[in-house]
Amino acid sequence: MNNVLFVALGGSIGAVLRYLISILMLQVFGSGFPFGTLMVNILGSFLMGVVYALGQVSEVSPEIKAFIGVGMLGALTTFSTFSNESLLLMQEGYLVKAILNVVVNVGVCIFVVYLGQQLVFSRY
C-alpha cells in the first residue's frame, strides 16, 4: 500500500508538470505542431534513463522507483496523446508533420534515454 501512495504523489506532480510544460510550449511555439507533447516525452525519457541507470549503479528504493518511474514519469509522458496528435495531423492533411512528429518523438526520446544513462554511468 505504501508504494501506491508514492505512485499517486509522483503522478500528481508529473501531471501538473505536463500541464505546465504544455502551456509553456503552446505560448512559445503556437499550435502548429504538438511541441508540448514532444517536450514532455523528451524530458520524461531523459529522466527515465537517469532513474534506470541510477538503479543499476546504486541502491534505489522501491518507493523512489514507484514515485519517479511509475508515478511522476508515467503521468508526465504520454503515448496516447502523441498517437492522437499524430493521427490528427494525418487526418488534417499534414502528412509530413505527422511523420516528423513520429520520427522526432521516437528518435529523440530513445536518444535522451541513452544520454540519461550515460550521464549517470560516467559518474559511477
Swiss-Prot record:
Keywords: Cell inner membrane, Cell membrane, Ion channel, Ion transport, Membrane, Metal-binding, Sodium, Transmembrane, Transmembrane helix, Transport. InterPro entries: FluC. It is a multi-pass membrane protein. The chain crosses the membrane at residues 5-27, 42-62, 63-83, 95-115. Disulfide bonds: none annotated. It is found in: Cell inner membrane. GO terms for cellular component: plasma membrane. One of its GO terms (molecular function) is metal ion binding. Na(+) is not transported, but it plays an essential structural role and its presence is essential for fluoride channel function. It comes from the Bacteria. The keyword Acetylation does not apply. Coiled coil: none annotated. One of its GO terms (biological process) is cellular detoxification of fluoride. The keyword Cell inner membrane applies. Fluoride-specific ion channel. Important for reducing fluoride concentration in the cell, thus reducing its toxicity. This is Fluoride-specific ion channel FluC. It comes from Shewanella piezotolerans (strain WP3 / JCM 13877). The lineage of its organism: Bacteria, Pseudomonadati, Pseudomonadota, Gammaproteobacteria, Alteromonadales. The gene is fluC.
